[in-house]
Amino acid sequence: MRILAVDDDPVFLMLLEHVLTAIGYKDLRTVESGAEAMTLLRDPRQKFDCLLLDIDMPGMTGIELCRRVRALQDYHDTPVVMITAMKSLDFVEPAFRAGANDYVHKPIDELEMRTRLRMVGDLIEERRRRASVESRFSTDHGLPVINVRFDEPVALSEAGSVIDYLALENYALTLGRLRLYGHSVLGFKVTNAESIFCSTDGIGYIDTMANVASVIDGALKSCNHLIAHAGRGEFVAMISQRTDLDVDLLQDEIDLAMDRYAHLHEALGIPLPDVTVGRILHTGFFTRTSVSSLFKEARQSVRDVAMVR
């Protein structure tokens, strides 16, 4: 794994190199500014598998750098781990919204960094496997292809509040029990997602799910929120307040917005997504519900609602 680390503190970069070498990651390049990083990333002779970005840098911050990195075709889905010494978590949501996959605290803990980079390595291998399948199909048939599995999350980028599912889980984990108590979680389900999946190719399916995400994003515009596709046409939204939204009103708004796509879907021969809204969930102050359990509960909730709708 080739890693690019960006931090304005040369002493920290030396310490980071020591930690990474100790845990087996020796292919490291370091630079001290966002501008230097962008020059390297735009160089076709350079290729990095993972980026470690300090958030609090003068000039171009790590969050702004992450946003610019995501605009580069070669790095639109490269794993990005943010690094910070800041105690406040106010930066966390903007970082994930800009495209970060995870984050670690300074001073760097060797075990934490090993765990984070192991997850990054798994992500890289999965993406390489998919890219290999797509490349073989494209070569054999002369057509562009995106390999999508129905059960798995797909990366969507059409709406400003949409992030990867793993990134949403990582964001929720950063909140801790007390901050998570102040959030709400809500599930959405495209009940005919399997029919849509079978009626089009990977590109068409992703485009359709992106349209659904955009509609959900618009319906939640009154709340600060993040959304992720979770697989099987299901979405999870995190709202940064304990809210009691009128889900019936939300359902009506989504139905109306989806109807605007009816002519397009009829022309394409793809079923119009039928979106169901689940129940709003909160964690209890004294409960220790895990993030994964909370998200699973949100998905099960919307499945239950869809069964009787």
Q: What are these language model-derived features?
A:
Residues 1-20, 51:
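Conserved acidic segment of CheY-like receiver
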Residues 7, 54, 84:
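Active-site residues of response regulator receiver
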Residues 57, 69:
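Receiver (REC) domain active-site loop signature in two-component systems and cognate sites
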Residues 225-240, 263-297:
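A short glycine-enriched loop-to-beta-strand structural element that forms part of the catalytic core
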